[in-house]
A protein has these predicted regions:
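Collagenous Gly-X-Y triple-helix signature in extracellular proteins
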Residues: 1-224
């Protein structure tokens, strides 16, 4: 005898999802780890590079407080650099990536989803000082991808993070860039060994790093 596992699909809309978020436990009722739902990025008429995109969002972790952490299953079509120059100075807080995600990408999400996103406190140790930001869109940290033990060497500046449940295996960390196949994508953590680099996830799902000014895949996250 053996079991056949089948996925269950729930038909819903943003209004119902928001009601569950406000009145019940979103993770228990609708969005457990591994759940997927579609989101779209509207085209920006003022920027020819910002075209309409259909993405799949995936629940990667649920916090002890019941907050649902979501990361897009594959990268956006548009790749982007962490900074305009090869530097990780200022970490996530001062990065061009952070500004781009929260000023350019966020407004392209459905208005109903924007209203549901909970700003998240990001903490990093930069040059011996704790730096905090409040962000609606963010990149995962090295710790959230690979765990605290590996981060002690690669990204000791990560503060208060824990590994996201879904990313415990290499296979779960592999992502594609549309039209390019499996690709490497950025993390928000400065690479500890070089001031010119940030950490990233290589195309095979393992840890790597890259020059901050190089364009790589972008798989952003948000909290519900």
């Amino acid at each position: 005898m053996f079991d056949i596992t089948k996925r269950t699909t729930i038909t819903t809309d943003w209004a119902q999802l928001k009601t569950v978020q406000e009145q019940m436990n979103l993770a228990e009722i609708m969005l457990e780890v591994g759940s997927e739902f579609p989101i779209c990025l509207e085209a920006d008429a003022d920027n020819e590079n910002d075209v309409f995109e259909q993405l799949t969002a995936q629940v990667v972790h649920v916090t002890k407080e019941g907050r649902v952490m979501v990361v897009v299953k594959d990268c956006m079509g548009q790749m982007h650099a962490m900074n305009d120059y090869a530097t990780n100075e200022g970490g996530w807080k001062d990065s061009a990536m952070r500004k781009w995600l929260n000023e350019d990408v966020l407004p392209r999400l459905p208005k109903e989803l924007q209203a549901m996103i909970v700003p998240r406190t990001i903490r990093q140790m930069i040059d011996g000082k704790e730096v905090q930001t409040q962000d609606k869109l963010w990149l995962p940290s090295f710790t959230e991808m690979f765990g605290a033990d590996a981060a002690a060497e690669w990204a000791p500046g990560d503060l208060g993070d824990e590994q996201f449940e879904l990313f415990a295996s290499e296979r779960s960390r592999v992502k594609e860039v549309p039209g390019r196949g499996t690709w490497w994508y950025w993390l928000r953590s400065p690479y500890a060994s070089y001031s010119t680099r940030f950490c990233l996830v290589y195309s095979l799902g393992n840890a790597d790093d890259g020059y901050a000014r190089y364009a790589a895949g972008v798989a952003f996250g948000f909290c519900l």
